[in-house]
Curated annotation (Swiss-Prot):
This is Succinate--CoA ligase [ADP-forming] subunit beta. It comes from Acidothermus cellulolyticus (strain ATCC 43068 / DSM 8971 / 11B). Succinyl-CoA synthetase functions in the citric acid cycle (TCA), coupling the hydrolysis of succinyl-CoA to the synthesis of either ATP or GTP and thus represents the only step of substrate-level phosphorylation in the TCA. The beta subunit provides nucleotide specificity of the enzyme and binds the substrate succinate, while the binding sites for coenzyme A and phosphate are found in the alpha subunit. The keyword NAD does not apply. The gene is sucC. InterPro entries: ATP-grasp (IPR011761), ATP-grasp_succ-CoA_synth-type (IPR013650), ATP_grasp_subdomain_1 (IPR013815), Succ-CoA_synthase_bsu_CS (IPR017866), SUCC_ACL_C (IPR005811), Succ_CoA_ligase-like_bsu (IPR005809), Succinyl-CoA_synth-like (IPR016102). Binds 1 Mg(2+) ion per subunit. ATP binds at K45, G52, R53, G54, V94, E99. Belongs to the succinate/malate CoA ligase beta subunit family.
Amino acid sequence: MDLFEYQAKELFAAHGVPITPGEVAENPDQAADIARRLGGRVVVKAQVKTGGRGKAGGVKLADDADAAAAAAEAILGMEIRGHRVHRVLVTTAVDIAHEYYVAFLVDRSRRSFLAMGSAEGGVEIEQVAAENPQAIVRVPIDATEGVDATLAARIADDIGFPAAVRDEAVRILRGLWEAFQAEDASLVEVNPLVRTLDDRLIALDGKVTLDDNADFRHPDRARFADPSAADPLEAKAKAAGLHYVKLDGEVGVIGNGAGLVMSTLDVVAYAGETYGGIRPANFLDIGGGASAEVMAAGLTVVLADPAVRAVLVNVFGGITACDAVARGIVAAFENLIAAGERIDVPLVVRLDGNRAAEGRAILAAAQLPRVEQVETMDDAARRVAELAAAAR
């Protein structure tokens, strides 16, 4: 889960990392009220989960409340890299002497953690890496030892914090590491971490990615959920306990096990080349041991996508029994018909493995509209691509 800037700063403050005072506004009047309370110059910043806000006009300085309201009016509703702005952060402006970059992240190549930093903050780190890679400091972190005062001091020195703020930099680095560990994050980034004219260090912007697999340890994470920022189908699937990712094609794909589903995506895309570039519309893994209820929920999610022109259900029965999958398909159709929904999307079903014969018999007996059974994966992919192309 990626956090908005204001949410990231909330976590920073909880772990002792200094931030500027600020509040979130959803309309210009709220922005003006916040600016009055803060007093002085403020910055009005679009809250979207992407970079490039400044270049897109999503960050504006305001000298007073009226200017803050005008800035909020200009920013709210704009689209930045495909993300609509629904709220802004109004925060105190500061005079900057220097900008730094600091981050902790998962280093997948080493199967451990990594500290990164640079004295060239304030721009996207990818740009620094491309133009001046030697300006980026990388310090591996032993997962069993973490970041103590000695290592934090080494990182601060490598980045190049001056003596006047070195101790504060060490304290902030340890606070960010604490946030990284305590919150089960895969990324904690401050860009920029600024040194002010009076030698204070402040996190002016922040990015945090939380590991969704650790949600069970953090029941309070629900407060970070933002329905306006989530794909409604992905949110619906997550609520049903399904692993669903929306893609940009026309063929809905349902399978059991991530490996099989990914292979199915490849086979569908390959077959789709013959039919004008037909592609998968989603990844949906119903998991091992899926019940009829889970299958029904998955099919309901996929059929709710208006981009889907055909659906491929590809199941190799192991722990997941094929007859349970078949009952789920029947249940999904019954529920949709009972709700008055028209089922005009064809389904291609390939069942193999545990209780496949029983599953195929259940589907044959149900005589569901527009459901075809196919024996092999390749034939199923070709047929679903053909049907999707015909329905374009």
